[in-house]
Amino acid sequence: MREDYLKSDDEQFTSGEKEIERALRPLSFDDFAGQDKILENLKIFVGAAKQRGEPLDHVLLHGPPGLGKTTLSNIISNELNSNIKITSGPVLEKPGDLAGLLTNLQTNDVLFIDEIHRLNSVVEEYLYSAMEDYKIDIMLDSGANARSIQIGLNPFTLIGATTRAGLLTSPLRARFGINARLEYYDAKLLTRIVQRSSDLLNTPILETAAFEIARRSRGTPRIANNLLRRTRDFAQIKGDGTITLEIARIALQALNVDHNGLDDMDNRILTTIIDKFKGGPVGLSTIATAVSEEAETIEEVYEPFLIQEGYLKRTSRGREVTPLAYKHLQRTPPAQSGTLFE
């Protein structure tokens, strides 16, 4: 279920829900909650670039899904009073795809590339000269008649977003002048986000209910907003339209989001490691096969929170559950084997 919560907007929402999702997104630095250090720095960098009349340095935003990388990119564009073009790494299959975007950028525009770690190597190399010198080389003809011409580009800012910064090549990473990692949110801050979103949705919500949704949202604003929208449905049908603590708990139980914010797949991963592999260590690909999920999805979507909260750990030999996982699942940990001298 939670993988749906973490998909991109185009994959996840109907046309009506897309409009609601966009309406919930903050449009300025002042509206954006959390990530205070990053915001403080970005305000300075954007303000200085505007004063000098220069494009903002290229920006790399990385961190787990749903923390606001796309939202921040749009905010940066708004604060620069510029237009933004949005694409993603897998879409840019050949240099011509990238060239079409770059040549249509106006001065100080923003080009946002989501999942930039998935750029193929040919397109990535083509991007280097565009980022450094605002120039690209285009090949004309082929074979013996092949020749290249250089085309100048308007100065622009590239914002790359990724959940897996470690997969970026060193040459690409080095070309970003601004590098920011977004971190998970605490429940108190997420409560503010839930309350703000409920106001925008014209849905009354009690503070206790907002906190209940927030603390089960895995530290992720996108999940908090999605749970809020679904809880609003329950309040409308099973209540009087106000989201109370009781309604929130009913909705979250129906959505299979447990007391600690873990969903079916989270618990399935932990249970599988305990029941089939004696708590680990076990390899990622083996876990993926056992739970019928893609290894990449487990690594990007599920593992970060399980590790962050202390249910799972990575070792040199594979993944292992922790005592907290046994406690959460109400299981008895295996007895520790004795040492040689006991």
UniProtKB/Swiss-Prot annotation:
Q: Where is this region: Small ATPAse domain (RuvB-S)?
A: 186-256
Biological processes, Gene Ontology terms = DNA recombination; DNA repair
Residues recorded as binding Mg(2+), renumbered to this chain, are: T70
Question: Could you name the Gene Ontology cellular component terms for this entry?
Answer: cytoplasm; Holliday junction resolvase complex
Asked if the Swiss-Prot or TrEMBL record annotates the protein with the keyword Transmembrane helix, the reply is: no
Q: Which residues bind DNA?
A: R314, R319
Its Enzyme Commission number(s) read 3.6.4.-
Record comment regarding domains = Has 3 domains, the large (RuvB-L) and small ATPase (RuvB-S) domains and the C-terminal head (RuvB-H) domain. The head domain binds DNA, while the ATPase domains jointly bind ATP, ADP or are empty depending on the state of the subunit in the translocation cycle. During a single DNA translocation step the structure of each domain remains the same, but their relative positions change.
Report quaternary structure and partners.
Answer: Homohexamer. Forms an RuvA(8)-RuvB(12)-Holliday junction (HJ) complex. HJ DNA is sandwiched between 2 RuvA tetramers; dsDNA enters through RuvA and exits via RuvB. An RuvB hexamer assembles on each DNA strand where it exits the tetramer. Each RuvB hexamer is contacted by two RuvA subunits (via domain III) on 2 adjacent RuvB subunits; this complex drives branch migration. In the full resolvosome a probable DNA-RuvA(4)-RuvB(12)-RuvC(2) complex forms which resolves the HJ.
Annotated protein name in UniProt? Holliday junction branch migration complex subunit RuvB
Q: From what organism does this protein derive?
A: Cytophaga hutchinsonii (strain ATCC 33406 / DSM 1761 / CIP 103989 / NBRC 15051 / NCIMB 9469 / D465)
